[in-house]
Amino acid sequence: DKAQTIVNGWKSRVQALRSRNAGKPVARVFYEVRYPNLLAAGRGGISSEILALAGGENVVSDGKKLVRYSEESLIAADPDAYIIQKGPMNPEPTPLAERDHYRDLRAQRAGRVLIVDEERFARPGPRALDAAEELENWLHR
């Protein structure tokens, strides 16, 4: 059956992601949903699942889907990588280098800042698996 073949293909890709990332260092990642009035992806949503599949760890420990996050907490977390979601929730994101308090973040200093499409990285569905594979390549390059 064609549907089962497609589902099996997705399962195989998920397993391949998990296998490739087993034993690799885990990057601590902040996922920005909106700025200003900083809103982060919490551990309860698809964005955090994509991060985990890609071999990253969300620095936001709250189990909600979306979390209001203070700049002080972000600076204290000092993530290895920073993802900025672009889309309806964050239509014209300000580059990290242009934000006074963000310039010294480890992610900014290391050039580990990625702007991603909200449609692919924040919506459940087959494209989320594509997003995880893309993010894995970026995190582990």
Located regions from the model:
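N-terminal ligand-binding lobe of clamshell/alpha-beta domains
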Residues: 1-141
